Every structure is written in C-alpha cells, then in structure tokens.
Amino acid sequence: MNWTLALPEIVLALCGLAILVFGVVQKKEQPFLSCSMLTIGAFVLTGFLVVMSPDGVGYNHIFVNDDFARFMKILSLAGGAFATMLTVGYARNMKVERFEFPVLLLFSTLGAMMMASSENLMTLFIGLELSSLAIYILCAFARDEVRGGEAGLKYFVLGSLASGLLLYGSSLVYGYAGTMEYGGIQMALSTSSTAVPMGLMFGIVFMLAGLTFKLSAVPFHMWTPDVYQGAPTSVTAYMAGAPKFAAFALLLRVMAGPFGHVAPQWQILVEGVSMLSMLFGSLAAIPQTDIKRLMAYSSIGHMGYALMGLCAGTAEGMRGTLVYLTTYLLMNVGAFAVIIAMRRKGREVTGIADLAGLGKTDPGLATAMAIFMFSMAGAPPLAGFFGKMMVFYAAINAHLFGLAAIGVVSSVIGGYYYVRIVKVMFFDDAAAPLDRRPLSLSFVSVGMGIATTGFLLVLGPVSSAAQAAAQALFR
C-alpha cells in the first residue's frame, strides 16, 4: 500500500488537529488571527504536497490520485485559503472571531479533497459528509444573527435530505453492481449482456440528485438564496467555491467512469438540469435588490454553464468544465472580497443601492467589482469569456446545438444584471462612503482583478493542465 498517495490529506488532517489544540491551549482570549494564519499555511503546504504527489490507486482501491484529483484539490485548497483570508479582516464585525472558524474551514476542505480522490462509493459519502457537516456549522456560526441560524438550519435539513438521496442511490448501485469500487461498477455495466436494470438507473438518478443539490443546480437550488444571504459573507464565498468544486469532482469522475457506459441514459437528465439552471439563474437574478441573493442566483446559472461540459461527455467537454471552474474561482473570490468590504459605520450593507456612486468614493474598489461583473457576464478578454467559450465549443462539437443556444441566450440575459451593478457604481448619485477596509481585502480584490484581467496569459498552461486532468477520467 502506497501511503504517500494520501500524504496531502494526512498532513492537512494533522495540521487541523494541531491548530485545534493550539487554539485551546492559547492563553489569548481569542487566538483567531494566529489560527487563521496557521490554517492558510497548512493550505499552502498541502498544495505543494498535492503537486508533488504520485499517481496511483491505493488503500484497497478506495483512493485514487491522478491529474484530475490534483487539479480539483488545488482548486479546493485555493477556495479554502482565500475564504480564510477574506475572514481575517472582518471577523470581529461578522461575529465569527473564534479559532474554531478556520479549523472548520480546514476540515471542510479536507472532505472536499477526499471527494476528489474517491474511488469507492464509501469514500465518496465519507468525504461528502465531512465537508458538509463543517459547512452546516459555519452557516450558523454567527449565533447572534437570526438569519444565520435560519440559514444553518435550512441548509442542514435540506442537505441531510440530499445526503439521504445520494446514500440511497449508492445502495441501489451497489445492490445491482455487486461492488462499491468504481472500476468494478464500470466492469459490471460494460460486460452486461442485458439492458441496464431499471433499479440501477434509479440509483444513478438518486445519486445525480444528491450531487446536483451540492451544486445548487435546478431543481435542487431552493436552499441557495436564503443560505447565501443569511450565512456570514466569508462562508458564502467559501460555499460558492470549494464545495461546488468537490461536488463537480465527484460528478465528473462518477459519470465519466463507472457510469460512462450508460451515458445516453443520464446525459438527457444532465442536459435538462443545465438548461434549467442557466435560464432560471439568469431570470431570477434580475429583480434582486440584495447583492448576496443576486450572487446566489448567479451561481445557479454558472453551475448550469459548467454542466454543459459534462453534457458533452467528451474529454473536450470535461476540459471546458475544469477551465470554467478555474475562472469561476477567480471571479467569485474577487466579487465576495468587494461584498465583504461593503460596510458603513461598522455595519454590513448588502443592498445593490448601497454601491451607488462607489466609482466616485472608492474608484479602486469599483473598478475591481466592474472587472468581476464583466467577467461573469462573459465579456472578452476577461477570464469568464474563455471559460464560457470552451464549454460552448464542447457543446457544439457534441451536436448539442439547443443547449449551446440556451447558454448564449442566458448569457445575454445575465449580462443585464451584471451591467446594472456597474451602472449603479459609476453613474448613480453617490451614497455615503464605505468604511476603510483592511489590507487583506485589498490584497485579495487586487490580486483577483489582475488574475481575471490577465487570464489570457496563463490560458495555455491552465488549459493544458485541464486537458491532462480530463484525459485521466477516460483512462
């Protein structure tokens, strides 16, 4: 057994336990800052170990490490590190200044990494629950906020239902395939001389339902707006990133691997989910006046675009999805850095109208937000354009012309509410200026703005890494 396959996960878990003990024994009343810095350091160290980790399958065929797993782990670690950085500046204002907060982010990211390396239905579920349980607590971490408690409870109840659907679907697949290993399931389906049993198809549908819930894709999106609005904003930024990357890692690996031989049966379902997510996300965001709710509906639409690559069912489509998720990370983290900076007299303001005149009172922050909004709309030459271009090309090459057409229409509709935010910032009468923001938020917003604007310079290496990751799914 090659234990080095899981060395990044082992190190991250040990770091999490060490930081937890450090926080308990610290004599400071609130060792939040030191624990946050240690958590970011643990993410960086784990990232280096992920890059250096070898390929292989180990631990009795329940854990796999390949180019795809490494790609998704790096995305998840980046999402966790950026969420921790976003928390540092405003932890006291958001009432989350307790050392357990970064530790929970760390263990949630650990679960996301386990999901990316899952090669067995059991590790799939364990990784999913490790990630989800930490997020349930994080959503309700601001105990004095009524909306935070409501968000945590709502996400817990609906998330438990989704986990039950996933577990029931997994049990059906295990019952019909006779094994929990992905390779064994794939062999059972590929060597079957009869039609695919209806019970097995029900199992696939239930698993698909559980995973699309984690993606906030239609029709399992109902929790997203309320939870995004009620949770602490840095938690919302995290939820919009790492957990979705992990769910996509599971979805792509399971659908391309063990269920690849029954692709015609599930592709039509995924295509419908993608269409509905794009249209609903774009249309429902138009009347929103709260920017966190708008970002929630926007994320529903973005997951629809990312699912287009899976609908294609090709390595080109998977590559498009991975590049899209990379660009989504940059845009999402940057936009939430601006949203966290929206404070007046120490109080959080999340109304779109509160951005009025930001171009006059804080032109740097307004310019960064404009970059992220135009990128989410898919305007060239920003990062979001290249992500959409790749998934659209993959859909067209797979002859999914209707899906591609709906994607274009949804992008045009979505452009309206993104441009509306830019209009409010630069052309409306100025509101009272926002509070001075900490250096960490300026660092993240500027860094993400530069990365989003100059993504073309790294498109080649990112696309090559995504291509290698996609090819690993079809070996």
From Swiss-Prot:
Domain of life from the UniProt record? Bacteria
Parts of the chain that traverse the membrane: 5-25, 32-52, 71-91, 99-119, 121-141, 155-175, 193-213, 232-252, 266-286, 294-314, 322-342, 366-386, 389-409, 439-459
Instruction: Supply the InterPro entries for this chain.
Output: NADH-Q_OxRdtase_suN/2, ND/Mrp_TM
Name where it's found.
Answer: Cell inner membrane
**What Gene Ontology terms describe what this protein does at the molecular function level?**
NADH dehydrogenase (ubiquinone) activity; NADH:ubiquinone reductase (non-electrogenic) activity; quinone binding
Reaction(s) catalysed by this chain, per the record, are:
a quinone + NADH + 5 H(+)(in) = a quinol + NAD(+) + 4 H(+)(out)
In the record, biological process GO terms are: ATP synthesis coupled electron transport
Q: Which UniProt keywords apply?
A: Cell inner membrane, Cell membrane, Membrane, NAD, Quinone, Translocase, Transmembrane, Transmembrane helix, Transport, Ubiquinone
Q: Establish whether keyword Cell membrane is in the entry.
A: yes
Membrane topology summary: Multi-pass membrane protein
What is the E.C. number?
7.1.1.-
Broad class of where this protein is predominantly found = membrane
One GO cellular-component annotation of the UniProt record comes to:
plasma membrane
Q: Which Pfam families did the record assign? A: Proton_antipo_M (PF00361)
Enzyme's top EC category: translocase
Instruction: Note the subunit structure.
Output: NDH-1 is composed of 14 different subunits. Subunits NuoA, H, J, K, L, M, N constitute the membrane sector of the complex.
Q: What does this protein do?
A: NDH-1 shuttles electrons from NADH, via FMN and iron-sulfur (Fe-S) centers, to quinones in the respiratory chain. The immediate electron acceptor for the enzyme in this species is believed to be ubiquinone. Couples the redox reaction to proton translocation (for every two electrons transferred, four hydrogen ions are translocated across the cytoplasmic membrane), and thus conserves the redox energy in a proton gradient.
The cross-references to NCBIfam families, in alphabetical order and at most eight, read: NDH_I_N, PRK05777.1-3
Q: Which family does it belong to?
A: Belongs to the complex I subunit 2 family.
Which protein are we looking at?
NADH-quinone oxidoreductase subunit N
